[in-house]
UniProtKB/Swiss-Prot annotation:
Self-association and partners: Homodimer. Heterotetramer of two MnmE and two MnmG subunits.
Source domain of life: Bacteria
Binding site for FAD: G13, G14, G15, H16, A17, G18
Residues annotated as binding NAD(+): 273-287
InterPro entries: FAD/NAD-bd_sf, GIDA_C_N, MnmG, MnmG-rel, MnmG-rel_CS, MnmG_C, MnmG_C_subdom, MnmG_C_subdom_sf
Required cofactor names: FAD
Family note: Belongs to the MnmG family.
The protein, known as: tRNA uridine 5-carboxymethylaminomethyl modification enzyme MnmG
Species in which this protein is naturally found: Acinetobacter baumannii (strain AYE)
Gene3D superfamilies in UniProt: FAD/NAD(P)-binding domain, GidA associated domain, C-terminal subdomain, tRNA uridine 5-carboxymethylaminomethyl modification enzyme MnmG/GidA
One family name in Pfam for this protein: GIDA_C_1st
Presence of keyword Protein transport: no
Length: 626
């Protein structure tokens, strides 16, 4: 059947990338179709039941600032919230939400089903319709043809997915779900640069068989933080504890004894696993000097006894999994509900993409999520939103948009993938960003919500809330600049009494806030401030880090000069005099779009960038005089 409706955007896959892509396109007013192999698994958390963490929560806040669904779903489904790095600087603080899988998934599905301009259809996609070098639509498993101006592919681990438990293997995109074999084959036919990666998950444990009394209790923070700028603590369901235990020498001996049947150590798995989320067998091998490793027992939800033992991801045979689990303190009688496994899947070299996440080879075809070599819900969601908004803009022949490295962690993510490529699952960290003082969790809305409004991603309710917040920040900052404390006035005396600090001359409340040991809470008490915690936090960070932030703005201004120098798409690097063969080859492989991107390619020297710039200028002069 040839489906009668022509869509602006078709999104294949209903995971974290797919849902954000579909919602973004639909919010922008495009007729959008979300194809999923199973409506019941929309927004499913395939691995750990958590959203956020170091570097990752920054992405979640950016998705949220652009009107995305992930942060609000985390607030509606979060059963424990914590601020990580709370004693460190504002740039590296991160929010983490332990999520109830069922509640999180329900929140995502509710958002999808109530989104205007969005149709959902349950069918696996088997084929892409490509005419010349342009995608025209999709053919499903049943042979239904859907036509579209653009297609976003967010297939997760389903492309050619193979599940491994010990030396046993089976086809699967996730435990209990079939892989996408036909689509994987079709993509290989299109001559896109394909590789194999792997990821894994731990065995799930029945909480009733665990002795928590011998473990360390890990409660959430109180008062509980929220993930979304539109979130509220009243959205949170019941809050629960997590628990910490450790592996031991006996555990490690059991694992070593099973390595001869490990698919990772017998060459059965060829795909590279995530460096920063290694399996337990990988930890034992790589960190052989360590006597133990932490295991975090995380509840999967409020209405289930299932626990996620974070830290023992494994693909060892089940009999070895059984022994290693029962060797851990507090888990001597543990009952395994589901075995751990590894999954190997196809991904495509992200260097074959444009910055909009459109493939260079096929016009109108966009990739997002694990298909691009990333790992994590947050990385997937960020790419999905960007791919969805750019597919939507292309569908209406509008100029596409991707944030720069100084605008968002999303920009860092995309630039890293396309400039550097990846041969292992890519995970976001704050350390990957040069301008992390400017790219904080708390100011994601300041950086992106105005842009999101212009793009059509941000609705009236969010926009009104953002404007109200920014007006409050402005008003309160101005007020504090005109409230004065002096050694002999009541406010000055109260300040000295409250803080024990010296006050030798008259200071504004803003000047007092600049002091290292003074926080906004103290200033609020001193001056009778009634603004929200969010507004107070923004003011405090802006005041305390003003000098550092100004220096970063100067660095960004220098970088922008390189960003503004575009490299023509057909630029011939072979004619650049003085470039080494190695650097020429690297530039021809990546084909950077700007001099700034060229400067970030490993091995490309500042001198080489200078030579390219000189050649571009010469070419431009020649064109002008011709």
């Amino acid at each position: 059947m040839h489906y009668p409706k022509v869509y602006d955007v078709i999104v294949i896959g209903g995971g974290h990338a797919g849902t954000e892509a579909a919602l973004a396109a639909a919010r922008m007013g495009r007729q959008t179709l979300l194809l999923t192999h199973n409506i019941e698994t929309l927004g499913q958390m395939s691995c750990n039941p958590a959203i956020g963490g170091i570097g990752k929560s920054h992405l979640v806040r950016e998705i949220d600032a652009l009107g995305g669904a992930m942060a609000l779903a985390a607030d509606k489904g979060g059963i424990q919230f914590r601020i990580l790095n709370s004693r460190k600087g504002a740039a590296v603080r991160a929010t983490r939400a332990q999520a109830d899988r069922v509640r999180y998934k329900a929140a995502i599905r509710e958002t999808l089903e109530n989104q205007a301009n969005l149709d959902i259809f349950q069918q696996a996609a088997d084929d892409l319709i490509v005419e010349g070098d342009t995608v025209k639509g999709v053919v499903t498993q049943m042979g239904i043809r859907f036509d579209a101006k653009t297609v976003v592919l967010t297939t997760g681990t389903f492309l050619g997915g193979v599940i491994h438990v010990g030396l046993e293997k089976s086809s699967g995109g996730r435990a209990g779900d079939p892989p996408s074999i036909a689509l994987a084959q079709r993509l290989r036919e299109l001559k896109l640069p394909v590789g194999r990666l792997k990821t894994g998950t731990p065995p799930r444990i029945d909480a009733r068989s665990v002795d928590f009394s011998v473990m360390t209790t890990q409660p959430g923070d109180f008062p509980s933080p929220v993930m979304s700028f539109m979130g509220d603590v009243s959205m949170h369901p019941e809050q629960v504890n997590c628990y910490i235990t450790h592996t031991n020498e006996k555990t490690h001996d059991i694992i070593r004894g099973g390595l001869d049947r490990s698919p990772m150590y017998t060459g059965v798995i060829e795909g590279v696993g995530p460096r920063y989320c290694p399996s337990i067998e990988d930890k034992i091998h790589r960190f052989s000097d360590k006597d133990s490793h932490q295991v975090f027992l995380e509840p999967e939800g409020l209405d289930t006894h299932e626990l996620y033992p974070n830290g023992i991801s494994t693909s060892l045979p089940f009999d070895v999994q059984f022994e290693l689990v029962r060797s851990i303190r507090g888990m001597e009688n543990a009952h395994i509900l589901r075995p751990g496994y590894a999954i190997e899947y196809d991904y495509f070299n992200p260097q074959a993409l444009k910055f909009t996440l459109e493939t260079k080879a096929i016009n109108g075809l966009y990739f997002a999520g694990q298909i691009n070599g990333t790992t994590g819900y947050e990385e997937a969601g960020a790419q999905g939103l960007l791919a969805g908004l750019n597919a939507a803009r292309r569908a209406w022949e509008q100029e596409e948009w991707t944030p720069k490295r100084d605008q968002a962690y999303m920009g860092v993510l995309v630039d890293d993938l396309i400039t550097l490529g990846t041969k292992e699952p890519y995970r976001m960290f704050t350390s990957r960003a040069e301008y992390r003082l400017m790219l904080r969790e708390d100011n994601a809305d300041q950086r992106l919500t105005t842009i999101g409004r212009e793009l059509g991603l941000v609705d009236d309710v969010r926009w009104a809330a953002y404007c109200e917040k920014m007006e409050a920040v402005e008003r309160e900052t101005s007020r504090l600049q005109h409230v004065w404390a002096a050694p002999n006035n009541p406010m000055g005396k109260k300040f000295v009494e409250m803080t024990g600090a010296d006050l030798s001359k008259e200071c504004s409340a803003i000047d007092l806030l600049k002091r290292p040991n003074i926080n906004f809470g103290q200033i609020a008490e001193l001056t009778g401030s009634e603004v929200s915690q969010q507004v107070g936090e923004q003011i405090e960070i802006a005041v305390k880090y003003e000098g550092y932030i100004n220096r970063q703005h100067e660095d960004v201004a220098q970088l922008k000069r390189l960003e503004e120098t575009k490299i023509p798409a057909d630029f011939d690097y072979d004619v650049v005099s003085g470039l080494s063969r190695e650097i020429t080859q690297k530039l021809k492989t990546v084909r950077p779009e700007t001099l700034a991107q060229a400067s970030r390619i490993p091995g490309v020297t500042p001198a080489a960038v200078q030579l390219v710039m000189i050649t571009i200028r010469k070419n431009n002069m020649t064109k002008k005089t011709a």
